[in-house]
Each structure stands twice: as structure tokens, then as C-alpha cells.
């Protein structure tokens, strides 16, 4: 369960707080650290960081994979302080793994970033509707782009000719996970309406 991915969650939090560990603007999906069945942008980010850590943040080794060695090193100190807090609270930390369970992490993010839950409005434009009727666009090359529902760790307003909202550091969500994790937050309403074509009253269940 989520307890088994505590270290990865702590590392994800450190990656959010720190600077981008990649040298240039890469699309995570095409990163050498992305795997076919990944559901979260954090999966290639964590693998890249583990590689940098094992390479002792060596500039040449990191640069070969577009990793910013200094930014990756900074993440280490944030990560250590977060794991120290977890240990003091008596939480048992798993061994950090590059092949951790995406589903258990997704469920943790659902609780932590509930306000950044979104649904895709269009596959072609990556337009999304966030909780609270906000609109935004999923970052290109996200590992969560195949899913209709997702949760983002970052939602940023980018000033330009128009203000655009960019949804990034995203994780795919499946409806059963949503119901399992957020059952206390969700309400199911039964709505009756008259269907003109079929000339009868239809009752629908809507989950909000």
C-alpha cells in the first residue's frame, strides 16, 4: 500500500520543492528514464534522481542524461530532512526503489493534492477542468496524458499575451481509486430528468 512507497512520496515532495532536476525543458514521456507502463510524471523524475544519486551527482554523468547535477544534489538535503521527520513520527521507510508502485503513489497524491484533481476535456488539446471549475492545459509529454482523470502536484499561471494555466507533475487516476480514497469527500446524487426522445423519466447517479 501507500506505506510501502513512503520514501518515494518523500522524494516526490523534495522534487516539488527543489528546482527542476533536468537541464533543459524535456518532455518526460520521451525521457530515457520513462517506462512504458508509467502513470506518473514522478516515475521518470525519481529514476533520474536515483541515477544522479548513485553517480554521486557527478557533472559529466548527469549532464549525459540532461540532469542538472546541482539541482539534484539540492533535492537530497530536502529529501533527508523530510525522511528525518517521518522517522521521528515512527514511520517505517521502505528502501528507495526505481520500480515502485505507481498506484499506491497515486492514492497518496489524491489525498495530498485533492484541490488539483482534474479531468481532460479534450485529448487533442490537453485541455482540462480542475476542481473548482478552473481551466488549464496538461503539460506536453506528461506520463498522465492517456488518462481522462489525473491529479497534479503543480498548477501554475503563466503570464503571456493571455494568462494560461499549466498543469504539471501529474499522475493518472482511475475512477475506482478516486472512490476508494475519497469516499468521505464524494457525494452521489440521483437526478431524475425527462428524456424527450424516449418519452420517459430517466434517473441518473452522478458522483461529485
Summary of predicted features, one role per range:
Residues 1-207:
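Second RecA-like catalytic domain
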